[in-house]
Amino acid sequence: LTNKTARFLVNGTSIPEVDFDVGE
């Protein structure tokens, strides 16, 4: 997990789609 992905995970785990978007 990168800094951006981790940030999204902490900010809201209810939006995995955004997490994947940033990860890609």
UniProtKB/Swiss-Prot annotation:
UniProt EC number: 3.4.16.-
Location relative to the cell: Secreted
GO terms for MF: carboxypeptidase activity
Documented activity regulation: Inhibited by DFP.
One BP annotation, GO: proteolysis
Domain of life per record: Eukaryota
Family in the record: Belongs to the peptidase S10 family.
The protein's name: Carboxypeptidase 1
Native source species: Aspergillus niger
Lineage: Eukaryota, Fungi, Dikarya, Ascomycota, Pezizomycotina
